[in-house]
Amino acid sequence: MSMDYDITPQRQVYLDARGYTILTACPGSGKTTSIVKKLLTVSHHCEEHYGTHTGFACLSFTNKACAELKQKYKEMHNERLTYPNEVLTIDSFIMQYVVLPFWYLCDECKKRPIVVNETEILDRIYYNNIQINGKWQQYPVMALRTYASLMRRKNPSLVSRDKTAFKWKHKPVIDANEIAYCNAAFTYRLEKGFISSSDALWMACDILEHHQGIAKALVMRFPYVIVDEAQDNSELHFEFFKLLKRAGLQNLEFVGDICQSIYGFNNARPELLQSMMKEGGWNVLPLSECRRSNQRIIDLYSKLKSSDVPAITSHGVEDKEIPIVVYKYDDGNVRDIIRNFHQVCENNDLPSRYIFRSIPVHFPAAY
């Protein structure tokens, strides 16, 4: 049994869109379902216009999100996603199609890399264990020994590199000595073949920038790229897709909501997506019909969102005239709030109960 999908004029415009598209999707607009609806048509588009060896790459940030896309695709189209199409996390796509096949083209990398995102494990590569007088002691590796005092204050595993600068804990490093330390720490782990996901992204951009033939081959293999949750892209993520665009990618979609970025702690730059929306060459489309909340709740939420975001309207949701309850939570009252929430639902005969804890960019809230 296939999944029902209500095609409204707004949705139809997105389904028909090709080229460079930015879809701004409000909460409850059916973003994921709309992507899934479009994927089957896009697969046919690739086959007809670019050849049977080509397909789409639909990319998101988590394995859970990718699993949901695959499951909904199966439910809607009564078939599984198969070669030559891919639904992957951005990290997996970068590793599988750029870093692992072409790591040797990155000057800093001397060994086939493996991804290690656990800081406790990554930190170990920077130290040697030496037995002195029967006791094991830890010393920095020779390449970083001159930065021993800095290593105690700033873990080398938390060093990262973006397009123009080094960072520590995702904050730019400006002191000359600290920049030299970050460069030594970054270079050392790439030489040893131990990298973080952030390092892999930097390597991918470095490889594509200096070897455009690889970027062009990737575009020939995947002539249609859809990026879900695009508001959580970092500057390097956007640079990666810019390099594909420069190599001839003619169909690129960014789908997301700049009000719902949850990876600000991990270099997410939703404002870059917002800036792109104002550039020429992009077809900016809204999905602003919310199927989750009544208009009163939407109007309250709209007081908090950016004025640049299209106005949201309720679509097909009955208003039961129940007073809106706004909870302010902290670590000490979460259980009480959940208990009260269930009681309010019970009192108003609401069988479906969902609790979301949001992590907006600018303020804490609970719904």
Task: Go through each PLM region and give its residues.
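P-loop NTPase Walker
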Residues: 1-105, 216
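Accessory N-terminal region flanking or inserted into the helicase ATPase core
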Residues: 1-27, 33-34, 55, 131-224, ...
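Helicase P-loop NTPase motor core
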Residues: 281-283, 288-367
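Conserved Walker B
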Residues: 222-233, 258-259
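Hydrophobic "anchor" residues on beta-strands that sit immediately upstream
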Residues: 85, 219, 224-227, 253
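DNA-processing P-loop NTPase/helicase core
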Residues: 96, 101-134
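Conserved RecA-like helicase ATPase core segment
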Residues: 235, 240-318
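A short beta-strand-to-loop transition that corresponds to the Sensor-1 phosphate-sensing loop
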Residues: 39, 60-63, 90-91, 255-259, ...
